[in-house]
Amino acid sequence: MLALVLGAVSPQAFAQQPAASSAVSTASQDVATRAVTRSTPAAALADRQLFYVAGESTMLYNTPDDSRPVRRLTVTTPVQRLSCEDEWCEVRTDDGKQGFVPETAISNIWIRASKADRRVYMYRGTRLMKTFKADFGYNAFSDKERRGSTSLRDHWRTPEGQFYVVRRNPNSQFYKALVLNYPTASDARRGYRNGIISRSERDAIIEADERISMPPMNTELGGWVEIHGDGTGAATNWTQGCVAVTNEDMNTLWWWTQVGTPVLVE
């Protein structure tokens, strides 16, 4: 499903690189339990068997072939992976329905972006695979509340919370970009409660959240928050709210992530 190869580095070689720690620390497991998508509440990806539908929606089948479809599973749908064989995986949904999906239709890759550490961490389930230095918003200490501007630089903030990659942009002005689903439904409710956006704007954002589609980006809450390239590699604060990594690191993230990849920003 992912077609981009990182130069001469194969995904197999990357997967064999040692994690930051040979064993997953308790702290990493605690973080993993908070790495959730909109649809994945508590167990999150700390469970080695918990995956999610990635890239695009997929069909759940009764048998490990495409002859007996059961239902369509949307992107970000959490599933428990039971076993895999011959490019098919047996999975169980949250409501207990069991069936088969193509092995390439699910993933357990997720991202944690730490404003305090100025780092981006990439995990596969509970395993920390890679750490990247990252640049964050001009105001590195506060959560995002509204759109920033040259006259409101304090509001150039990186939003905190649970997001997912809603779009991948290979032609970004910042090399490549993973667009996050900010503002989320919770951002919209808070913005409406605080008088920042209108009722219709709130409802449009909530509707997009429910459809698992790109939310409106033109309200006073701001938008187009991305993990993108052209970062300094020096862990500074200069963006208007995005997370910037070097282009080399962006290539790595681009290879491993898909639409639906969970992103925890804290």
Stretches found by the model and what they are:
Residues M1-V9:
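Bacterial N-terminal signal peptides
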Residues A13-A15:
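Boundary at the C-terminal end of the N-terminal hydrophobic targeting segment
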Residues Q17, S22-V24, Q29-S39, W156-E160, ...:
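Exported/periplasmic cell-wall-interacting domains
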Residues V24-S39, D66-T104:
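SH3/SH3-like beta-barrel superfamily modules
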Residues N62-R68, S149-T150, E248-M250:
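Short alpha-helix capping/helix-loop boundary micro-motifs
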Residues S67-R72, D154-H155, L253-W254:
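Short, surface-exposed secondary-structure edge patches
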Residues E103-A140:
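A structural motif detector for short, solvent-exposed N-terminal "entry" segments of globular domains
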Residues L128, K133-E160:
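Electropositive
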